[in-house]
Amino acid sequence: MKKGDIFFMEKKKMKLWKKIAFTVLAAVIIIPTVGVIVNASIINEIIVSQRKTINEQNFSYTVQANSAENITTKIYYKDGTKMYVIQNNDRNMIMWKSQSTDEMINVVPTALKATISKCDEDKTANIPYLIDEQTSKTMKLSSIITSEKVNGEDCYKVNNLGLILWYSKSTGMIVKAMNGTMTTDGKETACVTEFKDWKFNELTDTDMTRPNLTGYKVTNNA
């Protein structure tokens, strides 16, 4: 092979390697950028739905975790009044909170006991897993987002650094959360919490009335 041919071949190889390097560099830059853009669009969509739902100020839902305690909590919220109905096998407890009276009442129906105390809770609806500004930035940059059905509902599955969240596409509300693991009877399983039966604008003032403590032994710490 002539010296000129060798030079030509080497030059051709250099051009090829430059093209390959440019393609790889472009892929390294473009693919993550596209991912961030897609993530941003989805997260913004969830946030818009959440804000619309929060503005309703009238909702209820049920929380159930796969824990050994077998606790189910029903949460009701309307115009500054919040009520929890906590069920643990045969034991029930009701917690009622009012922003207007700054009052919190804990009721144990089976024991006919109640405690009244001052409510210093934050004046918000406290919906779980709402996406704030800082969380939004993290999710957009570091999440893997796919679509998945949970209990028949279309959801966005957001895997953010090991914390996996499923958000309803229609309401933006959290439907399911998976975070860490637990060991039960020597078996390691994922810690899963489900947020079910979301309902909006169905609660009435009667539903959220202060508990009737007639016949209860009441401890007043207000």
Residue ranges of predicted features:
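N-terminal leader/targeting segments and the immediate start of mature chains
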Residues: 3-81, 204-222
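A generic structural signal for ordered secondary structure
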Residues: 58, 144-145, 155
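Gly/Pro-enriched, hydrophobic low-complexity segments
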Residues: 65, 84-94, 105, 148-214
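An acidic-aromatic
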Residues: 70-129, 175-176, 180-191
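Tryptophan-centered short beta-strand motifs
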Residues: 114-116, 155, 216
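Short acidic, Pro/Gly- and aromatic-enriched capping/linker segments at domain boundaries
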Residues: 131-149
